[in-house]
Amino acid sequence: MLLLELKKTNQTLETIHFLGIGGVGMSGIAEILHNLGYKVQGSDLVENYNTKRLESYGIKIFLGHAKQHITNVSYVVISSAINSNNPEIKEALERKIPIIRRAEMLAELMRLKCSVAVSGSHGKTTTTSLMACLFEAAGLCPTVINGGIINNKSTNAYLGSSNYLIAEADESDATFIHIPSTIAIITNIDPEHLDYYKDFETLIGAFKSFITNLPFYGFAVCCIDHTIVRKLVDDITERKIVTYGIDSEDAHIIAFNINTDIASSTFDVKINIPNVLGTTIIEKITIPTPGRHNILNSLAAIAVGIELDFGIKAIKNGFNNFKGVKRRFTKVAEYNNAVVIDDYAHHPEEIKATLATARNIADKQNGKVIAIFQPHRYSRMQHLFDDFMRCFNDADMIYITDIYAAGEEPIEGVTGQNLVDKITKNKHHDQANFLAELEDVVGVIIDNAASGDMIIIMGAGNISSFANELDERLSSRT
């Protein structure tokens, strides 16, 4: 029996326990189930923004993991980040409590909706958020499950009143190919999560299945500026695919006349989708977030809006209402007329896109770009070491901390210091420095910040918490 049907009967699911409930993906699903009337609880190692938010809704949160936490639960939901040695998993196995993967629970929520699944190596969260704003502007309030905090809502998930559900589809362990989506988005495909997939071709194959698993009446939206995505699109003939890009003249949706500053991007769009609009120009679309990569993200949302006949007014209004996403080029401080930005970038391609945006802004202000980066996961650094060496070219100064483990064991020779040494040795940059402590970031800013500078703090680890305290820390040092 389907999960949502079960709720409509007199049967109950008793308690659903989320292991790692503070994660962005897990917290979103937990919140939706809570809003649907299910009894939800969860555990995580540390308190964070998500656990505090869920607790404020009346959801019981355990800090730390212990077998006692699942004494009276019927189901345990886990993500791929949870180790099989976790005491709560061991207890669930011992007591034969069903263990459900996050993707399976997400799929169940999506099954009875017209679902939009947003996938890709980068840009998923912003694309999902932009699309949600367009749906609302079109009068369709969707249910949304996102991988980041949507500033408009101060949450990463909310229950809507329409028959649409928009979800970020996590490709990290291939479970996304089983999501029952009607509309599938692929923003890009880069070598990522190779600790799971083992090789790039297997990862590409998973994205192909993601599209071919669509129902015959569904469609995919793909960015063909990305070489791998273009090849994938060329290989698929059995599903409808709408393409978009900036550099691809043969794309169905193309952005041009682009202007960007520290707070926004403005552009025109040419639309040429057979049997939909013919050739149409939409002038002066503005999104309140900078960067070429975010223009591409907005084109994916526009493609869906055009296919669903939202209308040009709804598309423009939706973007005007967008307030951004937490940790996506977020201003956290100013010092000596320099701006400090916090960003989630943790993959070489994300770092390049973020620094390119900063470079564009800094050049207009006669400033420099100072990049401060905390690497995330030893396995990612090992697989993409050469790419990490080459991704900081748009920065004038680079500061790299030690690697945030995210539960992984250290790998010999894979360190932040080693990355700095190799960047210098191979002459990729002559201003690369190692930071032994996060606290040293304060001194870097005080010693180097000047008017017009863009100071970009990047990483998927705990550097964000530190970045959000910088305004106070810098004030106390002046």
Swiss-Prot record:
By sequence similarity, the record places it as follows: Belongs to the MurCDEF family.
NCBIfam families attached to this UniProt entry: murC
- Where's it found, cell-wise? Cytoplasm
Top enzyme class of this protein? ligase
| Gene Ontology CC entries for this record | cytoplasm
Task: Please name the source species.
Answer: Rickettsia akari (strain Hartford)
This enzyme's EC code(s) = 6.3.2.8
Q: Which residues are listed for ATP binding in this entry?
A: 120-126
Q: What is the lineage of its organism?
A: Bacteria, Pseudomonadati, Pseudomonadota, Alphaproteobacteria, Rickettsiales
One GO biological process term is:
cell division
Catalyses which reaction? Answer: UDP-N-acetyl-alpha-D-muramate + L-alanine + ATP = UDP-N-acetyl-alpha-D-muramoyl-L-alanine + ADP + phosphate + H(+)
**Protein name listed in UniProt:** UDP-N-acetylmuramate--L-alanine ligase
Task: Name the gene behind this protein.
Answer: murC
Drop me one GO molecular function for this one. Answer: ATP binding
Q: Does the keyword Magnesium apply?
A: no
Q: InterPro entries this protein is in?
A: Mur-like_cat_sf, Mur_ligase_C, Mur_ligase_C_dom_sf, Mur_ligase_cen, Mur_ligase_N, MurCDEF_pg_biosynth, UDP-N-AcMur_Ala_ligase_MurC
Q: What does this protein do?
A: Cell wall formation.
Chief subcellular site? cytoplasm
Give the highest taxon in the source lineage: Bacteria
Q: In which pathway does it act?
A: Cell wall biogenesis; peptidoglycan biosynthesis
Q: Which UniProt keywords apply?
A: ATP-binding, Cell cycle, Cell division, Cell shape, Cell wall biogenesis/degradation, Cytoplasm, Ligase, Nucleotide-binding, Peptidoglycan synthesis
